[in-house]
């Protein structure tokens, strides 16, 4: 399948949060007011105005502190459950750009709270966010405006360590698999997360749960099936609305 893909190599991440700041800056999103929660992670979670978040998982192993860094963002699924769920609900807020594969939200489309909750719950990675004030939904846009002009997404452009990579899907898959083999020599548990169903591929060296609760979708086949079912029932939902 063609289109664009991110490859995020967590083994190179220093949690500088340059990607997080660049995302805010390019999208002109405001800073999120936060309070100290006893962690270096800031803000606490993704939001309507925070599309990219470097998560800090601070654990103890063999009586030594261990940090796992995870630059969280939308996975831009090949078969996006959020989009098919929205369509089955009659919500016209989510589309997919066929050239890049980017899953795009229109934050100006008003979405009912109940529908937004259903859409968010359909996402295995807990990404979609709803704004109570505007009643719109938002998330990572793959910097579609930059990509269409031949530029890298802001987060990739600013990354100083090579953690963030972006390009044609075939090239990114090749890069990811090559890097996986290199890393496995030292970290046998290393794996690529859900590479067969997403356009944001993570390389991790340990149990994904140590990085983040929603780092990996447990049953990729089931997710793909659910998306396919929603795709099939969408015409029926549209017909039902047409008939009143």
Predicted features, each with a name:
Residues 1-244:
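Non-ligating segments of multi-cofactor redox enzymes
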């Amino acid at each position: 399948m063609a289109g664009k893909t991110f490859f995020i190599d967590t083994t190179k991440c220093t949690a500088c949060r340059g990607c997080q700041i660049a995302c805010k800056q390019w999208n002109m999103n405001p800073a999120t007011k936060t309070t100290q929660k006893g962690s270096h992670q800031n803000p606490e979670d993704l939001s309507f105005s925070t599309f990219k978040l470097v998560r800090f998982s601070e654990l103890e192993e063999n009586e030594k502190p261990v940090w796992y860094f995870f630059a969280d963002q939308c996975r831009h699924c090949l078969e996006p459950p959020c989009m098919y769920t929205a369509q089955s609900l009659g919500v016209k807020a989510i589309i997919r750009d066929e050239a890049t594969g980017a899953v795009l939200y229109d934050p100006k489309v008003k979405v009912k709270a109940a529908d937004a909750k259903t859409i968010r719950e359909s996402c295995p990675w807990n990404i979609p966010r709803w704004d109570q004030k505007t009643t719109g939904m938002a998330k990572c846009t793959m910097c579609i405006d930059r990509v269409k002009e031949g530029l890298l997404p802001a987060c990739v452009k600013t990354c100083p360590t090579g953690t963030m990579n972006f390009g044609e899907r075939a090239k990114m898959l090749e890069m990811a698999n090559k890097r996986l083999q290199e890393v496995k020599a030292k970290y046998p548990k290393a794996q690529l997360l859900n590479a067969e169903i997403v356009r944001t591929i993570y390389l991790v060296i340990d149990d994904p749960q140590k990085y983040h609760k929603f780092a990996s979708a447990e049953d990729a086949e089931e997710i793909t099936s659910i998306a396919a079912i929603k795709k099939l029932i969408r015409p029926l939902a549209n017909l039902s609305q047409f008939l009143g």
